[in-house]
Amino acid sequence: ETQVIYPKDIGLIIMLADIFPGAKVVEAGFGSGALTLGLLRSTGNSGSVTSYELRKNQATKALNNISPFMKDMHNLTIKYGDIYEQLDETNVDRLVLDVPEPWNVVPHATRMLLPGGIFLSFLPTVLQVHKLVNELTQTCFQLIETAETLLRPWHVTQKSMRPTHRMVAHTGFITTARLCSPRPR
């Protein structure tokens, strides 16, 4: 089974990746479909989302999760395959990854993203982030940043205010990088 990406992370992913109406987005790790739904809504009717998934049964579950919220999915393409080996898209605005080894996608990303395109990866551990950032720095990616979202709700009444007893803290790290053109020699 897959882990659902929380709304707090989906919102930050959409903002940090600058997902805009009309964007051409490639996603890997279709998962539950929660992030895909956010990407589809953000790209709008004029954009497109291509999602890679290894398992057809998982993609079917994700589509079943998405369909009650979005009947028209004309701008969603699902490709079955290993993103580490197969990435044939070009002129992509944004690449959004929820896979365990995103550093293996970096060489493909440099060929598929447009100059100025954004690479984003969602990872659970800091060791994975470290390995990814080391790989990104060896290429034409710049403005490499990593963040996490901690959501702390508050209990507010007429007579008191305090944080609630439960907090959705660490769920993952979000790393972004922007593809730059190589310097002329």
Segments (PLM) and residue ranges:
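Conserved SAM/SAH-binding loop
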Residues: 6, 31-32
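Conserved class I S-adenosyl-L-methionine
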Residues: 20-31
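Conserved S-adenosyl-L-methionine
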Residues: 22, 41-48, 115
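Conserved SAM-binding loop of SAM-dependent methyltransferases across substrates and taxa
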Residues: 32-45, 110-111
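A short glycine-rich, Lys/Arg-flanked "PGG" loop and its adjoining helix->strand segment in the class I
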Residues: 40, 103-117, 135-137
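S-adenosyl-L-methionine
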Residues: 52-103
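Conserved beta-strand signature within the Rossmann-like core of class I S-adenosyl-L-methionine
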Residues: 116-124, 128
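SAM/dcSAM-binding transferase cores
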Residues: 134-185
